[in-house]
Swiss-Prot record:
Belongs to the bacterial solute-binding protein 5 family. Disruption phenotype: Deletion of the gene does not affect sensitivity to ampicillin. Mutant does not accumulate peptidoglycans fragments in the extracellular milieu. Deletion of the yejABEF operon leads to the accumulation of anhydromuramyl tri-, tetra- and pentapeptides in large quantities in the extracellular milieu. The yejABEF mutant, but not the single yejA mutant, displays cell swelling and lysis as well as a severe growth defect. The complex is composed of one ATP-binding protein (YejF), two transmembrane proteins (YejB and YejE) and a solute-binding protein (YejA). Gene3D superfamilies: Dipeptide-binding Protein, Domain 3, Periplasmic binding protein-like II. GO terms for biological process: microcin transport; peptide transport; protein transport. Probably part of the ABC transporter complex YejABEF, which is likely involved in broad-spectrum peptide import. It comes from the Bacteria. This is Probable peptide-binding protein YejA. Disulfide bonds: none annotated.
Amino acid sequence: MILAPLKSRILIALAASALLIPAVASAQSTDVWRKGISTVGELKHPDGFDHFDYVNTKAPKGGTLRLSTSGTFDTLNPLLAKGERATGLSLVYDTLMKSTEEELSASYGLLAEGVSYPDDIEKATFRLRQDAKWADGKPVTPEDVVFSFEKAKDLSPQLATYYTHVTKAEVSGERDITFTFDEKNNRELPQIVGQLLIVPKHWWEGTGPDGKPRDISRGTLEPVMGSGPYKIAAVSPGSSVTYERRDDYWGKDVNVNVGMNNFKTIAYTFFADQDVEFQAFKSGTVDFRQEASSSRWVTGYDFPAVKEGRVKKEELPNIYRSVGIMQAFVPNMRREKFQNPKLRKALNYAFDFEELNRTLAYGQFQRITSFFMGSELASSGLPTGRELEILQELKDQVPPEVFTTEYRNPVAGDPAKQRDNLREAVKLMKEAGYELRGNRMVNAATGQQLDMEFLIDSSGMERTILPYVQNLKKIGINATIRTVDASQYTNRTRSFDFDVTIKLWATSANPGNEQADFWGSAAADRQGSNNLAGIKNPAVDALVRKVIFAPNRDEQVAAARALDRVLLANSYVIPQFYRGEMFIAYWNTLIRPENLPEYGVGFPDAWWSGKAGN
């Protein structure tokens, strides 16, 4: 999957269910072909709907959207896990189904005109639209879909995990592809298969402009071809990518695309320095900015264009409101020094969130208290009902405080409270086998000082980490910060070569297979997985399976809350913070839909240029 073009890109795994809208029956089969998939009640839109409600069907086409992104890139290959992919590649490609920001975990046919599967969901068959075409005019075929699936699993450890229960894809008709699953009744699987990004088999097996065969297992800076609404018009390696809307796009009149893809050109510029990136926005060379810094939002947007109304500022409900999130400092438990849960708990006592929130964030953050923060999946209080029953099944494998103690982070915010917290941290460190000798926290058995290096990819993050580092030093820990470029950071985190890093996990309102990639034992040793903490816990594995195979919503919520409690009780991470709003700023040449969708901002798909047609 290609990540969304907003800066806070995240890979959200949407789940599937049996609550589906039926379409026409196949002439050769009694199976029902469905035009959409949803897990939260019935689909909002009936078969044959015209367009999503939030789009402007009369939005003018044209104009240029200039965007910025952090880091760099060295490949345009959309499936390759190695290297740094360019931002925006999703503009070039289509998926079998298209999700909507109006609904939770709902998708409608894009390349596929329908999907069919039996009641036990042992397989799912997708039927391609007859008029789906690649940019070179050739039809999108079932062979392309099979090729895309196989290469996605081969080339991306993350996608291999995501599709781990999809064992096979095969051509099953002139326009049909059947995916076989290794377990029945996993309601998520048809949905996640529908998210599969489809690439052209014939193009990747063809010859490039240099006369050499293309190789999808390698990086490339040749403009890739897709079936989507845009093509790559210009590339400056590592610096910029420009996409241009295709006038001959086959799917421009498909209902899920009506009112979308309005900009003629979308150009991304890559910045290594966040301050330079912000200056580019201030100068008017970048049109849109999602602001991640609370302090900059409060103090940095007083330039003339804002005062004169030429730059608009908006505070909108956070795009994460449809999901649960965990953002945290992540100790790498593959390293022996972080394997004791009491030591990890001690690290939480050294983090003074309240002081950081007051001095750096102007009080705009909330402390994260759940791995599903902000959603109904978050645990609270003590377990009861079905949640308690699930935990009792694993009573001998989970910390006893799961049943007796509500999870709470330490609270500081003033010197006295922080001193108390640091004393508690020292006590926990002693229980973990460490002791203070002078001003050094050492392993009581070896005498070796505990050291911790925080690995980050942006100097702008140092302001957040420095107060934490200073507190760790107060209790004798040799804490340091190492800032590396985006490429080094990616390579080191993929290979788990770090002490502590920062990670944000985002979970859809209907969690599924991604949970195994986040917390599962199998993912702990697979390079490129999202299990950065290195969690290997049979109880966690069992709870992940209960989440994935929950037969109904009530069971899913209970299982997710039980999972949340066990993850929290093991102190796998040091939770950071969460903001209830997202901050966006944009030049008044951009126009957004009057009514934004419930679970997003519709950017950039449904926005348009005020200069279009001029």
